[in-house]
Structures are given as structure tokens and as C-alpha cells.
């Protein structure tokens, strides 16, 4: 069993867990540049294409709720191997989809199986690290994970430039990544949850564990904070392919760059937490992040209402994504530090809420395909609600932590 690894072993674990964690972002972001092509090829509306993203998010949500508790009972390694293998197969099903209905169904399966990478990478970190090392490794994992939203759409756009490539090719690439990850897990990942720390598996036990988490006021405060603020970012994920390309007229490759630079924003936000977390309490940094998120999205909404220059949208979203990096890193650290044996279930709930909200808001962005206002409005409202959750449900700890 691993415990607080150092040196090369630590770096190897960071790489492996980072690869698992980015499976979700790759699954979400890599095919975004092909949205207009998918709509044309499958004779589908923008909202129907966005529904394929919603299906993926629903799959990620439900999958985490199942995989998390199962891993608390069965260990991390076996469920991970099974799910990632099935992810590779479901990616092939996506590539072979002849119509939008089949693609939506295949995307649900793809999201469901990819959920293991998200939830179990975090649970493994909690198994292996404690205290300040837990916070530092979460920050490192977030930096690795943040590269995916930057690289994924660029990779997707680059793939579409190949003379033989279509949107199907992107899913073939995801299939190959899945099979490579299966080999990596089988060869390099040790079990991190010892038998004596496992929770007996049953529906009743899973419900009881989730119930205890839902009653934990502080935990739910952090969960709802990341749920709404990060969940609202999926309005940007599903909206910008059409806003940037159809409303502002940029090419798929330029869109990929504009979308991808926000990975740098997430990295910057995560770096701020990792760099200053030992000097300023993470809750104080989180407070700054949620306030900044409200301000940035208020500016974004204003710019969409007056049809401001593209640069104003890009800058507002970049600042907003810095706060996403801060919120993701700090909320997971603050929420997970006391979860111990129920880390898998806690990780599942933390990962589920943003995806659940994202699955709701994604198709709403396409209600009016001629304006970016729905995207801006959704991002602003979710930032406000997330901030209210933070200030309302975690305030009992402000005195002792700040």
C-alpha cells in the first residue's frame, strides 16, 4: 500500500492519477470544435448536439455515485480497470454512431465509464496523503488536470485539420487513449485502500454513507459551492463552440486556441492555492475566488447583452476560469480533509454536483442560437448561488480558520 510517496514514486503517481483525472475533461472538451460539423453531418440542431454533451455529463454524474461507494467496498484498482476498459469500447460506439440519437446514447455510456477516472483519482489521493501533503498533491493534480481543457480542444481542432479526419476520428483517438490507460493501470497502479479500511458493500450502506454526507453542513457548503460555480462553467463549455464560431465567426482552430488558453487560467488558479495555501488559509482564498467569480460573470453578462467585442468575453471568461481553478482545488481539500474511510463516496458527491448542474445548463445555452446572453446569464446566476452556499453554509468555521 502506498502512503505519502516521495521523489520519483510521487511524480509517477501524479502522472498516472493526472491521466485518469483528465479522462473526464478530454471526454468533454476534445470534440467541442466539431460541434458545427456534427450538427451538419447528422442533420441535428445546436441544442441536440449540446444534448450529447448533457448525456455525457449525466453519465459522469451517475457513474460517480455508483463507482465511489463500490470502490469504498471493493478497493480502487479493480473498478478502475473495468470502467476504463469499457470507456474505450464506448468511445468506439461514439465513433460509429450513424445519427444523433445513437451518439447521445453512446455519449452517456462514455461519460458513465469515464467517471471512474474522476472519482477514483481523488479517492486514491485521499488514501495516500494526509494533512498539508494532501493539499499540495491536490494542487499538483489540479495543475495536471487543468492542462486537459487547454490541450483537448486544440487536439480536436488539429485532428480536424488532417485530410482524412472527421468528427468520428476524435472518438477513435479517445478509444486509443482508453486502451493505453488500461495498460498503464494494470502495470503501474497498486491498490491503495487496505481491506481493514473498506466499507461493506450494500445499497443500505451506500445510502447511509451518502445520507451522512448530506447532513454534514460544512461538507455540503463546500460541495454546493463547487457544484454551482464549476457547474455553471459548463454553460461556457457548451456555449462557446457556437458563440465563438457562429456568432463571432472564428474558425474551429481559432476557437480551439481561445478555448484552450483557459486551461492556463485554471492552472493559475490552482497554483495560487498551492503557493499561498500555507501562508493564507485556503478558506480565505476560497472567499476571494467566489467573490471574483461573481464580478467576472457580471461583466460577462453585461458584455453579452450589449454584444460587446469578442475580447471582452474572452477576458471575462479567463478571469472566471482562474477562480474555477481556485475553487476546485480549495473546496476539494477543505471538504475531503475529514472524510477518511468514506473518501470514495465524498469524492463522488463532490464530483457529481458540478456535472449534474452542467447537464442541466448545457442544453439551455442553445435556446437562442443568435445571442450569447443565455450563456452569460447562466454563468452569473450559478456563480451567485455558489457564493451564497459558501457564505451561508460554511460560515461557522470562519472564525477558527481565517
Curated annotation (Swiss-Prot):
Under the cellular component aspect of Gene Ontology, which terms does the record hold? plasma membrane
Could you cite one Gene Ontology molecular function of this protein? transmembrane transporter activity
Superkingdom in the source lineage: Bacteria
Keywords from UniProt, A to Z, are: Cell membrane, Membrane, Transmembrane, Transmembrane helix, Transport
Q: Which InterPro entries match?
A: Efflux_drug-R_Bcr/CmlA, MFS, MFS_dom, MFS_trans_sf
Annotated SUPFAM superfamilies: MFS general substrate transporter (SSF103473)
Q: What is the membrane topology listed in the Swiss-Prot or TrEMBL record?
A: Multi-pass membrane protein
Q: Which GO terms describe its biological process?
A: transmembrane transport; xenobiotic detoxification by transmembrane export across the plasma membrane
What is any Pfam family matched here?
A: MFS_1
Residues passing through the membrane, by range: 11-31, 48-68, 80-100, 108-125, 140-160, 167-187, 219-239, 254-274, 286-306, 308-328, 347-367, 373-393
The main location class comes to membrane
Compartment(s) where it occurs, according to its Swiss-Prot or TrEMBL record: Cell membrane
Q: Which family does it belong to?
A: Belongs to the major facilitator superfamily. Bcr/CmlA family.
Q: What is this protein called?
A: Uncharacterized MFS-type transporter YdgK
